Amino acid sequence: MALRKATKEDVDHLSRRPLGLFTQTRIGAMPRVRRVRVGEEGGRKVCLFSVTAPASKAGSNTSATFDHFVAAAVELPERIEGRLAILRRGPLHSPRKPQFAEAKDGVDARVLDDYHVYASDPTLAAAVLDGALADWLVKDGHGAYYEIVHDLAVAYKGRNFMLTPRKSLLGRARALADRVPATAGS
């Protein structure tokens, strides 16, 4: 699989996706999508990218702090009507929380021990987070945040330096996409 530098249209299309990662920050600024690479693997579109989001301003408007994320996205085999965020619990780096409610009903308790789950529809969370996906999240899915948005599975993590292995995130996004139950889209 060879990834190529994204065109302006590719970046614009990705930036318009309703990912929690792209929501307006608490200081009213919009995150910026950067370093986008796109390609195809096994007949599905894949994408690697970085996001820089202003987190706070210093006393004068001349300085700000930023949250930095690296992410990978893989096209789902089947479209899902709705959005789901699976955000790992932990004190170190807070993810971009989506604008819908936390879902707990019908979600595997093992998943809830390790992750906060948010869904546009609570029944979607229960339908998606069972079986193989729940097992993978608990056993091998640690270390990243996940979102499923319509036809896209995204894995991302905060980064403090430029050397975060982006290809490993692509593997996580691919594993997530491969484990979403086919019946969840209906």
For the regions a protein language model found, what residue spans apply to each?
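Charged, low-complexity intrinsically disordered regions
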Residues: 2-186
